């Protein structure tokens, strides 16, 4: 599988990525998208949301800080994406706790997102498996992958055009015909908020460049994890680590051989 991935850099066109995300990670996502060579826009007002979605090359929907107005805008943008075949990533933030968010994600499945993303607890909750998630965080008790992989394979038969991206100590990417178990990363990424959201935004970037949902998911989660691995963290504080994550995102794309450092396996 690693050999099947091709280097997406340099970015061929400076795509516009529409992020409907939360206020907490908004700035990090914008800078991360810029670091890869694309352009971000953040618009979630129902009065203008379609103006920006129609100009975009990919849509990223993140359910953090959901409100009634934002939900209305999300539904409008998702419907447009479905009708116009615009690549779409849905990040199921907080569905372990919020019945409103879980219901919204299940409705968004009707719009056939290209990628459905979440942590282990969130995805287990969505597909009806036992979970221990609290708030928006995954539980260490939910890291068993064998039962989850089987259920996700079944879901991919129902939604054949969609890939699942499940983040955790080992990241899972599941599509109708392929499964990847990826092992890059470092625990220090948990030091700062928004890194999971950033993976979703980077997935949208790679979708805008013509990658499949499976390819874009593998590239996005591996790219962030490998960038983080390059940071020397001994004695480093939170803010410096956050700065270096964004710094490495802009530098790693210069390495023509970065794909060779992806750890993991894939099978059909």
Curated annotation (Swiss-Prot):
Free-text function comment from the UniProt entry: Catalyzes the phosphorylation of the hydroxyl group of 4-methyl-5-beta-hydroxyethylthiazole (THZ).
Listed GO MF terms: ATP binding; hydroxyethylthiazole kinase activity; magnesium ion binding
Listed name of the protein: Hydroxyethylthiazole kinase 2
Pathway annotation: Cofactor biosynthesis; thiamine diphosphate biosynthesis; 4-methyl-5-(2-phosphoethyl)-thiazole from 5-(2-hydroxyethyl)-4-methylthiazole: step 1/1
UniProt EC number: 2.7.1.50
Species whose genome carries this gene: Streptococcus pneumoniae (strain CGSP14)
One GO-annotated biological process of the protein: thiamine diphosphate biosynthetic process
Residues involved in substrate binding: 42, 194
HAMAP family hit by this protein: Thz_kinase
Gene transcribed to yield this protein: thiM2
Xref: Gene3D superfamilies: 3.40.1190.20
Keyword terms, alphabetized: ATP-binding, Kinase, Magnesium, Metal-binding, Nucleotide-binding, Thiamine biosynthesis, Transferase
Pfam families with a match to the protein in the record: HK (PF02110)
Keyword GTP-binding assigned: no
Family statement drawn from the similarity comment of this UniProt entry: Belongs to the Thz kinase family.
Residues annotated as binding ATP: 117, 167
The organism's place on the tree of life at top rank: Bacteria
InterPro entries from the UniProt entry: Hyethyz_kinase, Ribokinase-like
Cofactor: Mg(2+)
Reaction catalyzed: 5-(2-hydroxyethyl)-4-methylthiazole + ATP = 4-methyl-5-(2-phosphooxyethyl)-thiazole + ADP + H(+)
């Amino acid at each position: 599988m690693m050999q099947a991935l091709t280097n997406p850099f340099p970015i061929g066109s400076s795509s516009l990525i529409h992020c409907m995300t939360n206020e907490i990670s908004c700035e990090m996502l914008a800078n991360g998208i810029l670091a890869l060579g694309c352009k971000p826009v953040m618009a979630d007002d129902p009065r203008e949301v379609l103006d920006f979605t129609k100009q975009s090359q990919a849509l990223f929907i993140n359910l953090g800080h959901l409100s009634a107005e934002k939900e209305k805008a999300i539904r409008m943008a998702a419907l447009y994406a479905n009708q116009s075949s615009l690549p779409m990533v849905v990040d199921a933030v907080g569905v372990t706790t919020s019945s409103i968010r879980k219901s919204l994600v299940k409705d968004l499945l009707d719009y056939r997102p290209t990628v459905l993303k979440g942590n282990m607890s969130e995805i287990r909750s969505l597909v009806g498996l036992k979970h221990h998630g609290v708030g928006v965080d995954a539980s260490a008790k939910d890291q068993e992958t064998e039962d989850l992989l089987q259920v996700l394979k079944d879901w991919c038969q129902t939604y054949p055009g969609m890939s699942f991206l499940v983040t955790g100590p080992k990241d899972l990417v599941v599509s109708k015909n392929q499964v990847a178990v990826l092992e890059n990363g470092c625990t220090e990424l948990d030091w700062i908020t928004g890194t999971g959201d950033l993976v979703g935004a980077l997935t949208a970037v790679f979708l805008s460049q013509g990658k499949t949902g499976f390819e874009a998911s593998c590239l996005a989660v591996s790219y962030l994890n490998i960038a983080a691995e390059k940071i020397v963290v001994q004695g480093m504080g939170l803010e410096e680590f956050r700065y270096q994550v964004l710094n490495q995102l802009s530098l790693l794309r210069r390495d023509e051989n970065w794909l060779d450092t992806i750890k993991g396996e894939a099978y059909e």
